[in-house]
Structure formats: structure tokens, C-alpha cells
Amino acid sequence: MFMAENRLQLQKGSAEETIERFYNRQGIETIEGFQQMFVTKTLNTEDTDEVKILTIWESEDSFNNWLNSDVFKEAHKNVRLKSDDDGQQSPILSNKVFKYDIGYHYQK
């Protein structure tokens, strides 16, 4: 199994609104190999909010298929970093993607 983490640094006070955007999934569940998604808010941050999107996949290839899919492009077409100079406000200050091999998983 494989896990991808997209770690978002957000303007303070924007985490809840960002999380709510995930209530209406936009196709990730249709990608072969997708298994689970967790969207988390880091507690007790000071200057910014932090939201992590954790997705579980059968394999890294499944995740890469998602990244290269038209479904991914469509789902992310309106996502902008705050630094993008297009006149639209975005709470996203930065993001970084981390990849993990899952060595052990237990679920009750």
C-alpha cells in the first residue's frame, strides 16, 4: 500500500472552509487503486492553519495515474496559491506533497 500527503499551509482561519471543499468529491473515488482519503486539520497552530490531505492507494502507480488523469486536472482547475497573481484570493500559502510506503496497517 501507498500513502500520499498533500500538506497545505493556509491563511489563519481558513482551514474549515478548505476542508468543506472535500465534502463533494470530484472524481478521485473513480480512479482505480484509490482506497481512502483523510482530510485533517493540525491543532494548535499559531500563525497559519495547516490542512493535510492523506490518500491511501493500492500502489504509487495508482496515485500517479490520479495525478496524470483528466479527473485530477478538472478537480484542481480552480485551485490557486495565494502568490498567483490573477486577482483571485486563495487561502493557500503553500503546499508540499510527501509520499510514503505503508509498511504496516491495522484497522479494527
From Swiss-Prot:
Write one Gene Ontology MF term. Answer: heme oxygenase (decyclizing) activity
Domain named ABM is located at: 2-93
**Quaternary data:** Homodimer.
The cellular location(s) given in this protein's UniProt record come to:
Cytoplasm
Q: Which GO terms describe its biological process?
A: heme catabolic process; iron import into cell
For this protein, the Enzyme Commission number is 1.14.99.48
Naturally occurring in which organism (per UniProt): Staphylococcus aureus (strain N315)
Q: Name one GO cellular component term.
A: cytoplasm
Q: What class of enzyme is it?
A: oxidoreductase
User: Which residue positions does UniProt flag as site: Transition state stabilizer?
Assistant: 66
| Chief place of localization | cytoplasm
Keywords for this protein: Cytoplasm, Heme, Iron, Metal-binding, Monooxygenase, Oxidoreductase
Q: Which family does it belong to?
A: Belongs to the antibiotic biosynthesis monooxygenase family. Heme-degrading monooxygenase IsdG subfamily.
Q: Where does heme bind?
A: 21-28, 76
| Reactions the enzyme catalyzes | heme b + 5 AH2 + 4 O2 + 2 H(+) = delta-staphylobilin + Fe(2+) + formaldehyde + 5 A + 4 H2O; heme b + 5 AH2 + 4 O2 + 2 H(+) = beta-staphylobilin + Fe(2+) + formaldehyde + 5 A + 4 H2O
Q: What's the protein name?
A: Heme oxygenase (staphylobilin-producing) 2
